Amino acid sequence: MYPNKSLLTRALVLSAGAALSGCSGIVMKPHGDIAQQQAQLIVTSTLLMLLIIVPVIALTLLFAYRYRQSNTDATYAPDWDHSTRLELIIWGAPLLIIIALGAITWITTHKLDPFRPLDRIAEGRPVPADVKPLEVYAVSMDWKWLFIYPEQGIATVNELAAPVDRPIHFRFTSTSVMNTFYVPALAGMIYTMPGMQTQLHAVINKPGVYDGLSAQYSGAGFSDMRFKFHGLSDEEFARWVDGNRIGGAALTRAGYLKLEQPSAKEPIQRFASVEPGLWSAIVDRCVDDRKMCSSQMMAIDAAGGAGKGGLAGTMRSAWRDAEGRNRERTVVAALCTPTNLLGLPAEAGTPAAQN
C-alpha cells in the first residue's frame, strides 16, 4: 500500500508541475499601463483582505490549541458571553477594511473606466497633446477576430498591431453571440455584443508579441479563437500597414458575409482596403443590404410599431450553421427610417459623414 501511495503522490506532483508549466505571470507583470494599474489594484485589494483573513486563521488555530480539552491550565469560563473590547475589534477592523476597499473600488472604477480616454501612457508620463489615439474596430466572429483600422483603411483577421506608447481606442461588436476580448499584457477583458458597441482605451508600453484570446465560451471553435498582438515602434507599424496594403485584398460587404460564416483555426488574413460604411453596417446588423438595420427597427418601435402590416416587410434569408448545413431564417427587409440612431462614428461614404 505505501509504495503505491508514494507513487500516486509523485504522479500527482509531476502532473501538477506539467499543467502549471504553461502558466505565465503576464497578468501580474503586464506591459501596458492600464493592465499594470489593474495588477496593482489586485495586489492592494488582496493585501487589505489578508489583514483580516490571516489573523482570523491564526487566532482560530491558536484558540483550538490553547482551549483544547486536554489543556487543564486554560481558563474555563462557561458563563462568559460578552467583551466590549472584543466586539470593537471583531466589528471595527472588518468595517475599516470594507470602507478602504469601497473607496479604492469607487476611485479605480472611474479611473480605469474603459470608455474613459487615457490621460497618461505610463506613470509620470502624460499623453502628449499632439498625439492622437489609434482607432481600431474589432469584431468577434464565429470563431475568429476581425480588426479594422479606419484611418489606415486596412483590416486583418487574427492579427493586431499598434505602436508602442501610443494610446489605442478600441471599439468592439460581435456578429452572433456575446464574447470577450482579452490581451492580458494590454488591459482587462471587454465584452463584445451583437448590435452594440463597447469601447476600450489602452496603451502598450513595451515592444513584443503578445497573446490575445476570447475569454468567454462562444461555441465549438472557442478554444482556437486566438490572435497575436504586436507592439511595434512607429517605423515598424508604418511598415506593417504598408505590408497589408500591398499584399491584401479588398474587404467588401460580400466578402464580410463570407468571412462571418462559422469557421475555426482561421489563418491570418490581410485586407488592403475596407468598403466605406462597413463598420456601421456591422454594428447596425445590416451588412446584407436586403435586411433591416437595428436602428430602423428602433425607429419603428419608437413610432409605435408597424402593426400587422409590418409582416409584409419580412423575407427569408439563407444561413449556414456551425455544422455547415444550409438553413433559412426570417428577417425583416429594409424600410426608410432616420440614420445613425446608434451614435456610430462617422465613416467615409456614409450619411453620417456627409452631414
Region locations from a protein language model:
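Short, Lys/Arg-rich N-terminal segment immediately upstream of the first membrane anchor
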Residues: 1-6, 78-82
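Hydrophobic alpha-helical segments
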Residues: 2-56
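Transmembrane alpha-helix boundary/anchor motif
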Residues: 18, 59-62, 104
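Non-transmembrane, membrane-proximal soluble domains of secreted or membrane proteins
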Residues: 24-42, 67-355
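Membrane-water interface of transmembrane alpha-helices
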Residues: 55-70
